[in-house]
Regions:
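Mid-chain, well-packed structural core segment of small domains
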Residues: 53, 58-85
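Oligomerization/assembly interface segments of phage tail-like spikes and tubes
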Residues: 51-64, 101-112
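Small/polar-rich, solvent-exposed N-terminal microdomains that initiate assembly or binding
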Residues: 1-49, 72
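Residues that cap or initiate secondary-structure elements
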Residues: 27, 39-41, 65-67, 111-115
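Acidic-leaning, charged glycine-interspersed low-complexity segments
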Residues: 74-119
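Short, solvent-exposed beta-strand/turn "edge" segments of beta-rich domains on protein surfaces
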Residues: 46-51, 96-98
Length: 119
């Protein structure tokens, strides 16, 4: 199984918000970014062994204002696109209980057994 999470995390360290792999426990510490792997499948085989892997990651930008989520999302999109990922989904949500805005985005890529991303 291919794990690109460390590579993605290393490219997101320069952002203006902490990147987490779990949902915020404290919604007073916003903005933040949540990164989760949502798919990791064998896309193609060669000589009976996995050759291409399809990976999908969901990134959520959380903030107290919609404008903050959009600004973070633009930076995230730039970073993930530079890595070779394609955005497949984007949606704005509002959590009334926490009064927090979030933008959910999904990114997909194909990579080989050497973790080289292709399109």
């Amino acid at each position: 199984m291919i794990d690109l999470l460390p590579d993605i995390l290393s490219h997101l360290t320069q952002l203006d918000a902490p990147v987490r792999t779990l949902y915020p426990a404290d919604f007073t510490q916003l903005p933040c970014i949540v990164l989760t792997e949502t798919a990791n499948d064998v896309f193609a085989r060669a000589d009976g062994a996995p050759h291409l892997h399809e990976v999908e990651y969901t990134l959520e930008s959380w903030a107290s204002a919609l404008s903050q989520t959009h600004a973070l999302a633009a930076k995230l999109d730039e970073k993930l696109s530079a890595l070779g990922f394609s955005r497949t989904y984007c949606c704005d949500l509002f959590d009334a209980a926490t009064r927090a805005h979030r933008r959910v985005m999904r990114y997909r890529a194909l990579c080989d057994e050497h973790r080289i991303i292709t399109q």
